[in-house]
Amino acid sequence: MIWKIVVGPKDGIVDARGERVRKDISEHLGIALGSVRTHDVYTIDADLADDDVERAARGPFSDPVIQHVTINQPLTSDFDMLIEVGFRPGVTDNTGRTAREAIQYLVDRTFTAEEGVYTSTQYLFKGLHDRDLAEKIASRQLANGLIQRWTIVAGGEKEPPVDASTIPRVSGQTTADVRRIDLNVTDDQLLQISREGMLALTLEEMHTIRDHFTDPQVIEQRQSCGLGAQVTDVELEALAQTWSEHCKHKIFAAMVSYEDEQGLQQIDSLFKTFIVGATREVRKNLADKDFCLSVFKDNAGVITFNDDWSLVFKVETHNSPSALDPYGGALTGIVGVNRDGMGTGMGARLIFNTDVFCFASPFFANELPPRLLHPRKIFEGVVEGVEHGGNKSGIPTINGSIQFDDRFAGKPLVYCGTAAIMPRLLHGQPSHEKKAQVGDHIVMTGGRIGKDGIHGATFSSEELHEGSPVTAVQIGDPITQRKMFDFLLLARDRGLYHSITDNGAGGLSSSVGEMAEDTGGFELHLDRAPLKYQGLRPWEILISEAQERMTLAVPPDKLDEFISLAAEMDVEASDLGVFTASGYFHCLYQGRTVCCLSMAFIHEGVPQMQLPARWTPPAVTEPDVAAPTDYAVILQQLLGRLNICSKESVVRRYDHEVQAGTVVKPLTGVSNDGPSDAAVFRPLYDSFEGVVVAHGICPSYSDIDTYHMMACAIDEGLRNYVATGGSMEHVAGLDNFCWCDPVLSEKTPDGLYKAAQLVRANQALYDYCVAFGVPLISGKDSMKNDYQIGERKISIPPTVLFSVIGKIDDVRRAVTMDVKKPGDLVYLLGRTEDELGGSQYYAQLGHLGANVPVVDAVSALQRYRTVNRAQQQGLLASCHDLADGGLGVALAEAAFAGGFGMDIDLDQLDAPVELRADRRLFSESQSRLLLTVQPQHQAQVEDLFSGQSCSLIGRVVERPELTVAGGDGRNIIQVPLSRLKDAWQAPLREM
């Protein structure tokens, strides 16, 4: 029987959700409506008694104080138009899943596989009479047609009947059908097989696969296990997933022919040469002070925290799915990187999340090309996805930022990070080490497998185009995942498994295939995998990226205890096969072999890409900019720029207090609304030792030179980290590259230049990580961040997020960015140069410029170490980094965050004498920090920084006003802090 429960607010109860929808429709679509009311709908398809449904409706599904509820009849007919939005068949419905569990508890029985609960939302409009307009509202504002469907009912019409046709159930039967694919065809046909199958395999890779399957020894081996010479769809899909750019990082592993003004050089793997090479050099220099435990070989990097605990950190990207479904893509991004942390070593407890987003302007007014969502819709969906992923998992989100550039309209960038801790030793063994053993059972825990996420790995290895698959979109379930994590930590502590990893890109194909490298093979029974619904073919079961799943190697003598504990904690665990030493990637379905690939071929057989690159410096020049007539107006304009303004409306949606460990929070100051440079987290309640996390990201400099963009991102991350108290003696970095396609082709005629940009960024990564003594412990690359449909192509600016994590010995010594007391002295550390290329000041005036900031690592490192000593001695009242907008913006932020003004004299800066006042104020020279110091500490501070660039430039004052004197002693800025703060808070206040 099918029931439809409708729940809505009683008369007189404010419908905040409906009012938000009305406002959004007005702002985004320009449609004025009288009012919007919302109802929650639960459609139940189960064998239940009427009383059971009534109890559910009046119990867990509604609040009788503020809500009305009806069963199988409309809640009201008082509307002009009704739009009901629900999920398409097969899309994860988290609320429906929770509702299903609630009813099961209520009636004390388990639903069958065919029974379920499906949720939807009704929007009831007053003042909407045009059905075409309603269709526009549904398709452009209320729903995402990729994952949702809707019905429209005009006032006076009857709602559709409640029957099987309204249930978004997946139809079809799971089948053992396996296709054989003939690869002995023309090159055009090989490319067609790759393209139509969404395999993202190149012609050379298709040739390699074809040649492998014509090898007589391979044919003989295949015949012995019941397979013919032709590749099966299961095998081809597994190869495509394993060889995808997303998983194999073929561009970073390529043989690069790089040409610049110094000549031609061959670089065998950017990753090995610059990233691994830098870390190897840093660790050698650290010698017995090396704190790295696990780098580049697990789901996340691991460093020491103290003698008893290890610290885990990873940052991922989830760009392509977020372009199609911002909410689901971002939610999957954060819960996915959570699994990376949990699945590192023998398993770690998650302590905090980070997030960094890159969007086009939410106020984008130009016409969008086909298949692109409006940047504001992406903004709102991504923020909500990360909010739900972190908040519902009980993990605080403590650090992040948002960058804006209209080139991110083609693909947004969604960086999600997570940190975790684990005991240094578990059962007498290092916790960061793990190894599956021959005979261990392959056990999958957590969620079930569905069509969601199929081809996610290969989809994210290409640009967004007409054929981008709907199935690549996933929606995570943080509650199911949290239950699984709690179970796994207990299983870890009981010693119930030998190894663990997450099911991310490529699903079982990736997780089991990678773990089997420990043993040399595996035997996987795909028909034993639990499914969300019928209708999946064997290859879909293998590569589905359905969320909330982990794969473990469980020894035979622990299997029963493991399965029993999982059942006790309401976590599904399935025995899918065994790890072997066979040398083969072996999958069966109903006892029949459907895939038998050499482990050596699937993991090492991909041909090395050949990547040509040629560096030609761009033709950029310095603009002839007149001195401002009103510096206060310019400063307010800069504070209101999207890349500088307050992101409080976003930050407030994240729980940064859960777990009670956040010491320095994302917002700080007298009113808790100033922008913190970094976050400080105390993970152990019996110790004052803390973790400091920060980041740097500078895409605006890429248009001039990606070498300096990378250097500035590293420096920005480190100075944010140091400003808050992070120790330069115990700090590690993570690099996350997001690039436009750098492979020369008809689609990318400027591939030589884009590849050279990539090389230069990697050169800087090596140079500055070695110079600063910062090892790289993990990272990721996303290399196809382009949109192309027809002749229209949008490529992102080359972007690298450089995340920094390390230690502060005593969180009580942490320093925040806000000024503290009138009378405190204001110092500027670091020299100010004429470096405004790519700056926010130039951007405000419509220019790019040429003088990109150049980082002097030698002086910066000395400065940062000295800042550490000053912090440890308690000499600094505040410390704030100078970044976008330079000194002017940093002064304003520190002042209005603390609630006190400043009197500043630009003549006191360490700068070229001829440097004009606007350039002194808005230069973005790197490695600079703004300090405030109590007068009694003046001598000590100046003694500490003796011989370095340390300028006393002013004082903190009682009056809430920023006053800046220019070169002739005349005040060029005298403006109330309230005006500056309002300019800074206004742009995104309502987002």
Task: List each language-model region with its residue ranges.
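Short glycine-/aliphatic-rich beta-strand segments at the starts of folded cytosolic domains
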Residues: M1-D11, T38-T43, S77-P89, T119-Y123, ...
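Short beta-strand-to-loop capping motifs
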Residues: V7-P9, T43-A49, V85-F87, Y123-A134, ...
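Short, surface-exposed ligand-recognition loops at beta-strand->loop->(often short) alpha-helix junctions
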Residues: V6-R17, L48, E84-R97, G127-D130, ...
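Non-catalytic interaction/regulatory segments
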Residues: E19, K23, D51-P64, D93, ...
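Glycine/proline-enriched, intrinsically flexible loops and inter-domain linkers
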Residues: L33, G90-T92, T112-A113, L124-K126, ...
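Long, contiguous binding/interaction regions
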Residues: I2, I13-D24, S923
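Acidic (E/D-rich), amphipathic helical modules within compact regulatory domains
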Residues: R20-D78
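Short, solvent-exposed interaction modules
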Residues: Q67-V117
